[in-house]
């Protein structure tokens, strides 16, 4: 990171369309390392720090020299990248070749390069002399995309820009794959990773640390956004190691079926979906629960004396008394007195959405654009609503988030409760969330932070004085009240094995956190800083940001203003060239955001430079384009 660029900014205004100083400083590093030196880089910037914009700005610079391929995990994130590409282009202030930038989801990229599940090696020559940018790089390994990336690296000898806020997920294996992809050497995983009997005992050994430092020296960019401008987090529940957890004591009904599942069906309970399910809610016989297609065809099937299912619809008093779910019993009782929007995480792949829907409806909460709840709770004369996001509804997620994040919904009056599975763990931003709930304990520390990071991030809150409440719910036995104060108390298997599933998962999470933090610390130490004049390829981009910052505070100045000239000559040393640049931005009516006039253009008026406000106006319905037909029909009124 080029700290010399950061030093050019004083009291940077972040509330307008802008490129942050650390983003420009990182862009300088990427251009020098990837384009000039043809070396790969791991952009390890903690969530919420704006690494997407950095990557897209870099793609615009690189497009002048090479083709750039950007891979993203899924179609929804592809839409986010396409939108952000428009933002990046508007802020770029320099030439680029858009035709040289290709953005693919991993699925479409797989289809492009495989024939009948076999890599089309003849087609890989198209990637010669190109650059690859991989979003959420920690997720591409262990599947065909990871294999394809390795083949392209070995065949085409091209550099990669890998984006990640989480380089280690369940084990250090992921980090090993990243090292392998970024370096010119083949990694022997057996030499760098120590393995115990359990996953939590898989560690990067000292040899691995040395390999990491040797092979990735000069290839790491680490950045963590300062905590300023963020609301405080208020964790609820009882103290549990270094956090707080809400103990939700199971009823006799839930505990009975929970124990049947644990003792008889789960030989590897830490990874068994049934334990995820019964820890959130029990629904009777597991053989039925694991065959939902069959269950949904049942007519008035009794699951419990006070709970039945009919054609996929749950009904009965149990949805209100909630003996089937200690977590939802706590949740429903608690939300009645809370104000603001809620984000609720769950990862129950089999019947999570089914349970959530009918518990919410039965307790007076209405489905967004769906069924109305029984005796509905109201806000501003409208029903309080909920929505459930799963991988099956990807096509409508963007529209749903537009509603959830809209200023009109800051109080939750349009959509109050957003339930989501793992699909929301990455690349999405939620605004004005005041309550974050974990119905399922995340698998890793990285995933936990990703979920929090959807909401608690810069620019997500207008009022940061009000705290964000976090509830980490754990289903526990009716008589369980253990104080968990130290990991050292749970080093023996016999002590861990008797714990409730959620408590074991929390301990697993904390064991892994120690290893994750160790690797984060190593990466932070390896991230290099330097102070140099800006790279020639980003001079205009940097100047554009300096100009935006200058004219935010200045509505009218003399054409020969010494402060403006001093600012420009801090980048362009030649005064004549600096004056020519000022002529160009004024005559080209450079776009700025001014604190008095808001959106404005620069104009010369007599001997002054002035900011002239503008707005776009148009006649409604001048053109209508029907994209639903096989051909476009253009009509005018």
Curated annotation (Swiss-Prot):
CDD domains: SF2_C. SUPFAM superfamilies: P-loop containing nucleoside triphosphate hydrolases. The keyword Oxidoreductase does not apply. This is Early transcription factor 70 kDa subunit. Acts with RNA polymerase to initiate transcription from early gene promoters. Is recruited by the RPO-associated protein of 94 kDa RAP94/OPG109 to form the early transcription complex, which also contains the core RNA polymerase. ETF heterodimer binds to early gene promoters. Residues 32-185 form the Helicase ATP-binding domain. Its main location: virion. GO terms for molecular function: ATP binding; DNA binding; helicase activity; hydrolase activity. Residues 327-507 form the Helicase C-terminal domain. It is an enzyme of class 3 (hydrolase). Pfam families: Helicase_C, ResIII. Belongs to the helicase family. VETF subfamily. It is found in: Virion. ATP binds at residues 45-52. PROSITE patterns: DEAH_ATP_HELICASE, HELICASE_ATP_BIND_1, HELICASE_CTER. Gene3D superfamilies: P-loop containing nucleotide triphosphate hydrolases. It comes from the Viruses. Heterodimer of a 70 kDa and a 82 kDa subunit. Part of the early transcription complex composed of ETF, RAP94/OPG109, and the DNA-directed RNA polymerase. InterPro entries: DNA/RNA_helicase_DEAH_CS (IPR002464), Helicase/UvrB_N (IPR006935), Helicase_ATP-bd (IPR014001), Helicase_C-like (IPR001650), P-loop_NTPase (IPR027417). Keywords: Activator, ATP-binding, DNA-binding, Helicase, Hydrolase, Late protein, Nucleotide-binding, Transcription, Transcription regulation, Virion. Its EC number is 3.6.4.-.
């Amino acid at each position: 990171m080029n700290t010399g660029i950061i030093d050019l900014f004083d009291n940077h205004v972040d509330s307008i369309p802008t490129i942050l100083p650390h983003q420009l400083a990182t862009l300088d590093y990427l251009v020098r390392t990837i384009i000039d030196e043809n070396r790969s880089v791991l952009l390890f910037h903690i969530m919420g720090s704006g690494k997407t914009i950095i990557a897209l700005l870099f793609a615009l610079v690189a497009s002048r020299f090479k083709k750039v391929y950007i891979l993203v995990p899924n179609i929804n994130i592809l839409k986010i990248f396409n939108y952000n590409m428009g933002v990046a282009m508007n802020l770029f202030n320099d030439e680029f070749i858009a035709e040289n930038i290709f953005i693919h989801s991993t699925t479409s990229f797989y289809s492009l390069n495989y024939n009948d599940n076999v890599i089309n090696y003849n087609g890989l020559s198209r990637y010669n002399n190109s650059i690859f940018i991989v979003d959420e790089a920690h997720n591409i390994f262990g599947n065909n995309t990871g294999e394809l990336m390795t083949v392209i690296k070995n065949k085409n000898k091209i550099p990669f820009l890998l984006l990640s806020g989480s380089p280690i997920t369940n084990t250090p294996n992921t980090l090993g794959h990243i090292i392998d992809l970024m370096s010119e050497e083949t990694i022997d995983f057996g030499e760098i990773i120590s393995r115990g009997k359990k996953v939590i005992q898989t560690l990067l050994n000292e040899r691995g640390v040395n390999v990491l430092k040797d092979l990735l020296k000069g290839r790491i960019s680490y950045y963590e956004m300062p905590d300023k401008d963020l609301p405080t987090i208020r964790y609820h529940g009882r103290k549990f190691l270094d956090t707080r957890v809400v103990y939700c004591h199971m009823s006799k009904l839930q505990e009975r079926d929970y124990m049947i599942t644990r003792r008889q069906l789960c030989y590897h309970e830490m990874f068994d979906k049934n334990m995820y399910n019964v820890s959130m809610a029990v629904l009777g016989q597991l053989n039925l629960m694991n065959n939902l297609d069959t269950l949904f065809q049942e007519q008035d099937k009794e699951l419990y004396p006070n709970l039945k299912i009919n054609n996929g619809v749950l009904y009965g008093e149990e949805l209100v008394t909630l003996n089937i779910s200690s977590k939802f019993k706590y949740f429903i009782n608690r939300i009645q007195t809370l104000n603001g929007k809620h984000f609720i995480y769950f990862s129950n792949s089999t019947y999570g959405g089914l349970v959530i829907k009918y518990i919410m409806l039965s307790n007076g909460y209405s489905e967004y654009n769906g069924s109305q709840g029984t005796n509905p709770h109201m806000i501003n004369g409208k029903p309080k609503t909920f929505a459930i996001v799963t991988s099956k509804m990807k096509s409508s997620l963007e529209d749903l988030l537009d509603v959830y994040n809209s200023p009109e919904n800051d109080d939750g009056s349009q959509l109050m409760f957003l339930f989501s599975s793992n699909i929301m763990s990455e690349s999405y931003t939620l605004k004005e969330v005041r309550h974050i709930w974990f119905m399922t304990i995340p698998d890793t520390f990285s995933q936990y932070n990703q979920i929090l990071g959807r909401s608690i991030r810069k620019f997500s809150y207008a009022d940061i004085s009000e705290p964000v409440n976090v509830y980490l719910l754990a289903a526990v036995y009716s008589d369980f009240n253990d104080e968990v104060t130290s990991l050292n108390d749970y080093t023996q298997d016999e002590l861990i094995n008797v714990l409730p599933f959620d408590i074991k998962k929390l301990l697993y999470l904390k064991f892994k956190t120690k290893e994750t933090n160790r690797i984060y610390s190593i990466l932070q130490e390896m991230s290099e800083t330097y102070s140099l004049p800006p790279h020639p390829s980003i001079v205009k981009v940097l100047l554009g940001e300096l100009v935006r910052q200058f004219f935010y505070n200045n509505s009218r100045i003399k054409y020969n203003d010494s402060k403006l000239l001093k600012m420009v000559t801090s980048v362009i040393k030649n005064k004549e060239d600096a004056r020519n640049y000022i002529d160009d931005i004024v005559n080209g009516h450079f776009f700025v955001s001014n604190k008095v006039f808001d959106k404005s253009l620069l104009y010369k008026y007599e001997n002054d430079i002035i900011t002239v406000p503008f707005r776009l106006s148009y006649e409604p319905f001048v053109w209508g384009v029907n994209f639903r037909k096989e051909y476009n029909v253009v009509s005018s009124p």
